[in-house]
């Protein structure tokens, strides 16, 4: 019987005490190597790795129980990758010197952005600069997520920030300096760029407080993303910022893949031509782009073909179709089959997997109605079956 790493360490520690000897306990390493690319495929240890999984937005601020429920449901779904972004970001801790531009004090469930006092970055009034919270309500939340994902054999795609202000993100960071410019200030102001670089370095070089593994050395991380949906304008600024920041990440961490995290629908994956990016990302919501399900299905094929032309993997890393649509089950079945059958499609991550909250209820999902739940319903069955077959997918020429 194979004993899990954490339990193995505990057993070793007990044995050392019983035998009255000093033991050197070496932290366990994640199983398997780092994810690589080969043409339009992701690979693991030289073999194709087809991405199947989901997004979850509260994994870095939900309670320990809420986080482990999501990860357990991901395992039940047969997922191999979960995507999230590091958040929240707030103003000054006194709440007044530099205001927080979103409702940090909300008492809502985690899924509805009740963060219960968690924050990663803040404005340090004493030092008049960005502060980083590495405590139990800060980066130790990320430590817990990574360690728990490893226990379950899950890989994580992690975006360093969110562009949007829902839990602060880049918008809170530009507000530290009094700016209201959402699309350019953060990406051009020397102070904001310095903050981002310091944050990236802090994360990459951090040693996990639970298992002792540095993030940049941890294969549990599937890939880093510069930001969730960096809506940078104009296009030349976007490309120059991506090139600069991706280069900085790789100068510190050559082990992991780097993606932009961009939605990339309107520009049709234009950033795939940036050499330093390892793979392409796109976020597909027919509702927001006024597309029929059939037109979106054709778009899947079109975007995977773009990947083939550039010889890079293309990942549909967000997509959703509201449960209020009577044909939701059939539409998901169609899209997932199209992705599965195309050898140039690298995989998919549905938006979004949610689990029981500490309130004992599932989130209300009254806004976009994209939530996926382990409720044994028809949608869950379709997604679960697609993930199971996708995780076992083999290419004809392998």
Spell out what each predicted region is.
Residues 360, 375-398:
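Carbohydrate-binding surfaces of carbohydrate-active enzymes
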Residues 16, 28-30:
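Cleavable N-terminal signal peptides
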Residues 12-23:
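Bacterial N-terminal signal peptides
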Residues 32-279, 283-291, 297-313, 323-330, ...:
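Active-site mouth of glycoside hydrolases
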Residues 6-7, 19, 227-228, 383, ...:
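Residue-level micro-sites within transmembrane alpha helices that shape
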Residues 2-14:
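Bacterial N-terminal signal peptides that target proteins for export
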């Amino acid at each position: 019987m194979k004993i899990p790493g954490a339990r193995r360490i505990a057993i070793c520690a007990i044995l050392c005490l019983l035998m009255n000897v000093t033991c050197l306990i070496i932290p366990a390493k994640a199983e398997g190597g780092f994810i690589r690319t080969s043409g339009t495929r992701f690979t693991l240890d030289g073999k194709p790795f087809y991405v199947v999984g989901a997004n979850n937005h509260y994994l870095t601020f939900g309670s320990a129980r809420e986080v482990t429920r999501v990860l357990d449901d991901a395992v039940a779904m047969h997922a191999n990758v979960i995507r999230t972004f590091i958040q929240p970001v707030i103003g000054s801790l006194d709440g007044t010197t530099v205001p927080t531009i979103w409702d940090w004090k909300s008492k809502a469930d985690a899924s509805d952005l009740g963060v219960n006092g968690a924050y990663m970055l803040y404005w340090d009034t004493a030092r008049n600069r960005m502060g980083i919270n590495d405590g139990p309500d800060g980066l130790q939340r990320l430590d817990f997520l990574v360690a728990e994902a490893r226990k379950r054999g899950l890989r994580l795609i992690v975006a360093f920030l969110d562009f949007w202000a829902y839990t602060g993100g880049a918008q809170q960071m530009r507000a530290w300096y009094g700016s209201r410019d959402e699309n350019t200030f953060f990406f051009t102001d020397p102070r904001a760029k310095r903050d981002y670089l310091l944050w990236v370095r802090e994360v990459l070089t951090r040693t996990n407080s639970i298992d002792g593994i540095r993030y940049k050395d941890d294969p549990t991380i599937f890939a880093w993303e510069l930001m969730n949906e960096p809506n940078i304008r104009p296009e030349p600024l976007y490309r120059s910022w991506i090139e600069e920041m991706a280069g900085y990440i790789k100068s510190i961490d050559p082990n992991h893949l780097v993606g932009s995290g961009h939605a990339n629908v309107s520009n049709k994956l234009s950033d795939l031509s940036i050499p330093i990016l390892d793979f392409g990302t796109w976020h597909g919501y027919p509702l927001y782009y006024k597309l029929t399900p059939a037109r979106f299905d054709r778009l899947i094929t079109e975007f995977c073909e773009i990947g083939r032309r550039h010889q890079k993997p293309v990942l549909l890393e967000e997509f959703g179709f509201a449960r209020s649509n009577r044909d939701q089950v059939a539409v998901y079945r169609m899209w997932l089959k199209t992705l599965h059958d195309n050898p140039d499609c690298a995989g998919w991550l549905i938006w979004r997997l949610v689990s029981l909250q500490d309130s004992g209820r599932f989130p209300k999902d009254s806004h976009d109605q994209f939530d996926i739940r382990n409720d044994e319903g028809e949608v869950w069955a379709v997604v679960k079956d697609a993930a199971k077959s996708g995780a076992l997918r083999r290419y004809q020429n392998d």
